[in-house]
């Protein structure tokens, strides 16, 4: 059988789909575009060269083919009366990778827009910021812009496998790796099965293939440029579930890492490697991976020396241990600090950091046992270890206690562990939010999480204040538009901007993205903004209600299956019966999970009367006739929201159809197709959820609508 899909089309790298938000076409309308004629560059580096090339390519894209851009190293040689100046120097107003953009006049009355930074990364970010502002026709005269990143670590995680498949990938195959002989077959596998859990070793053995860096190195360079344009400074290139084949990325496949690292480095993006905790065994050198065993510790030190001798700019390692079948320190009776510190010690001499995921829980739970609670696992595992981790260890904590459900409370770990470095983990790829078949703009959700109060202490209570950086599983693949659904590009753009400055509003971010992507047509801005800003709430309305989560088809996680996980070992239950629904997580009669929060959150969630409606079923098992703060019963809320959500998708389609002829034809057609797929799926969700709970409760819809 021959499988065909979007991956097999030739990618047009000049298309609007491919160019994303960095096509720079809007600069043609800027009053300041003539400054691009002359560029003064006072420092040299590979990253500065990328910054200059960005200005150069922009100039030749927007100007007449006969125009010439001049690059200078000496200000005295500048012939024009307007220029852009790039330079590095100490500046008390700047920190880390921040930049200053300033309008000034020289002694000989020339006009200049200067970009100053403390390092070359800052200059590059300043150039992208300048171009972004030019596209929005910003008035620079007598202005000074100081922009420092809120966090030093701003990374994306790839769940790419070395054979070219992508776990939870919904935009085609990997842009980083591919099979040597069966590339098209592996792309077909991605088309056929999408982002189901990682490719298993049996499939790889059946193909008997070898693996390499993707042939299209130009696309990897374009991707690095895309990341840099929104301030992302790190990329973990391979799946956190490291299998046997990927283990060799730190052995005889290390040249793959070197090639990717060199390309990423041109754009100020550090490369990180997910590693196999059991690598000493997998690579056949030792019989144990015990982190306190001297031979194991020596093995890792030598391995780190080898890796950094070939990839000197590697940012560090990422580890998923003791979770979902992955090996870890628990195997040897050790704790996670033992495991993390052993690896952190090995890479410390090279400036490497060790990112250790906190996604640790018992995935072999007995559904009959109501005392076991997956939500409690990360806190119970890591909180007692506060202060035990080395300074170059960073714990990567999911935004919520479960697994990127459309509504969860913040993870309790953000309100504790003051002596430990913490990263927040978000998910850009839409595993549980429509898999890039549905439009679901995630920035408003992330804003809620980052601004949430933990009540940990008076000086740093907000989640954004209590983390050292942000990470996110990225949504990129080999599709021409990068993200499967064109509008899903807004999530990658939004993540980058939010990781740089979490004070930006969702409205600011989406207005920027629309302007950079589509231009300044007011109808486009109005309609696309209306679709995106309402999409997360809409998705929540027609899927799982009131924070209960899940109810998705097992395995691939797309579409409704109310009882799909109800009797599974994964700890993902809704506990619905003929009387009510919800998980009891109170201190008095539930699992006690609510007790992991600081006051007043502990009491807020623990008390049925004060628990927010949107999280009610996450914390409490209630009857279908329980009255919400809205005045509706739980069952009527379920009926109403599912009808409302489905109707909202109809409105999305109508608003998009108004843009025919105004947006790029290919973008219009592909997006309309996805919106229609979304409506069909939303209707399935509506009818299956409403029918399930009508049959379970026997309570009719007050409005008499059709329920099956």
Functional labels for PLM-detected ranges:
Residues 210, 285-511, 517:
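Catalytic-core regions of glycoside hydrolase
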